[in-house]
Swiss-Prot record:
The keyword RNA-binding does not apply. Disruption phenotype: Embryonic lethal. In 0-2 hr embryos, mutants display signs of incomplete chromosome segregation during mitotic divisions likely due to defective organization of spindle microtubules. Component of the crb-galla-Xpd (CGX) complex which is essential for proper mitotic chromosome segregation in early embryos. The CGX complex is also required for cell proliferation in developing wing disks. In the CGX complex, acts with crb to recruit Xpd thus forming the functional complex. InterPro entries: FSCA_dom_sf, MIP18, MIP18-like. Keywords: Cell cycle, Cell division, Chromosome partition, Mitosis. This is MIP18 family protein galla-2. The keyword Cell cycle applies. One of its GO terms (cellular component) is cytosolic [4Fe-4S] assembly targeting complex. Belongs to the MIP18 family. It comes from Drosophila melanogaster (Fruit fly). SUPFAM superfamilies: Fe-S cluster assembly (FSCA) domain-like. Pfam families: FeS_assembly_P. Component of the CGX complex composed of crb, galla (galla-1 or galla-2) and Xpd. Interacts with crb (via intracellular domain). Also able to interact with Xpd in the absence of crb. Interacts with Mms19.
């Protein structure tokens, strides 16, 4: 975790209501393709590395910035750091990626990128997040893996 907070007073947004599961969604015999809301529900409660808030509360992740194509096995997440020079952007992106890789079936190709035009180092961060070897190497770093696990751990 950082020793000095970059954005000491971030905007905080209301959480959206929890989704009520339908009988069809709970029935294992009914085909139920993944949708944007289901993906959002997986990442909305990721903890911000700087603040005691979730990525949803900071509008870092939003349902309308998720694209999913269940039949083509692809998920694309755009996330928006709270400030354009956020040094935590790569860590946030890694946390989103790890949460989805651990939660979704392995058939999915997961892409995590910064929302275009919202970060000073957008291209460099996106390149790091897209590089499977760099992501794997980052997760082999015990300290970094511990921080990511803290971000994706459920509170309470």
């Amino acid at each position: 975790m950082p020793t000095e907070i970059e954005n000491i007073n971030p905007n905080v947004y209301d959480r959206i209501k929890e989704r009520v599961l339908t009988a069809n969604e709970e029935d294992e015999n009914v085909p139920d393709p993944f949708d944007k809301r289901e993906i959002f529900d997986l990442i909305r409660n990721i903890n911000d590395p700087e603040h005691p808030l979730t990525l949803e509360e900071l509008h870092v992740v939003q349902e309308d910035l998720i694209r999913i194509n269940d039949s083509q096995n692809s998920v694309h997440i755009s996330f928006t750091p709270t400030i354009p020079h956020c040094s935590m952007a790569t860590l946030i992106g890694l946390s989103i990626r790890v949460k989805l890789l651990r939660s979704l079936p392995p058939r999915f190709k997961v892409t995590v990128e910064i929302t275009p035009g919202t970060h000073a180092s957008e291209l460099a961060v996106n390149k790091q997040l897209a590089d499977k070897e760099r992501v794997a190497a980052a997760l082999e770093n015990n300290h970094l893996a511990e921080v990511i696990n803290q971000c994706i751990a459920a509170k309470g």
